[in-house]
Amino acid sequence: MARRKVRPRLIAELARRVRALREQRERPRDSVRYALDYETLIRPHSGRKLPLRAWVDVRRESRLLQLLGRLPFFGLGRLVTRKSWLWQHDEPCYWRLTRVRPDYTAQNLDHGKAWGILTFKGKTESEAREIEQVMHHDWRLVPKHEEAAFTSFTPAPEETPRPVPYPPLLRAMILAERQKNGDPSTEEPMLSLERIRTDPWDYPENQEAKKKTKGTAV
């Protein structure tokens, strides 16, 4: 029986997977990548110094895994938020933790990964996903007795703006275009003022989409 030949594409795909596995094994753990010398505020692995605006938060605030390491079961089911969200948004912004995987090679179990369901500006996502920027020093734990008040939110009624007439020059151009195209419509052209809704700049998914991160992780 003739031996079946292996397609070159399958060999290339296998080699790609082997390279990816080696890179993953050789990649330094988060406890090494994000280790910080609190005296010089330099990360030993990269040799980079934290930006000036992060110095105060590094000494006063905590990383996410630093908070969760003090709680039973690493705080599963608890609510965590960020100081920047509390300052910038009036609507509730928080993560409800569903899964935590600490880095057991870290000295104080203060590094690792976490997953949760995001509520941003009062809108809750349907599925849990990995929490980004867990190494930043601006995470805060919502006390249990304050969770009900923190999550309560009544959205304000949205008012649909009324359309307004076009400026005279634009109106004349639109009517001339209609006449040129043979449009017999006599409807007055109106300008809609309805806003196109976009996610805020600090929405976590928008930050994940950025391929190039400026500066050093706080």
From Swiss-Prot:
Molecular function (Gene Ontology), one example: structural constituent of ribosome
The keyword Plastid is assigned to this record: no
Keyword Repeat annotated: no
Self-association and partners: Component of the mitochondrial ribosome small subunit (28S) which comprises a 12S rRNA and about 30 distinct proteins.
This protein's name: Small ribosomal subunit protein mS34
Organism from which the protein derives: Bos taurus
Family: Belongs to the mitochondrion-specific ribosomal protein mS34 family.
Keyword terms of this UniProt record: Mitochondrion, Ribonucleoprotein, Ribosomal protein
Cellular compartment(s): Mitochondrion
Region Disordered, residue ranges: 178-218
Record function comment: Required for mitochondrial translation, plays a role in maintaining the stability of the small ribosomal subunit and the 12S rRNA that are required for mitoribosome formation.
Gene name, Swiss-Prot/TrEMBL: MRPS34
Classification via InterPro entries: Ribosomal_mS34
GO biological process terms, semicolon-separated: mitochondrial translation
One Gene Ontology term, aspect cellular component: mitochondrial small ribosomal subunit
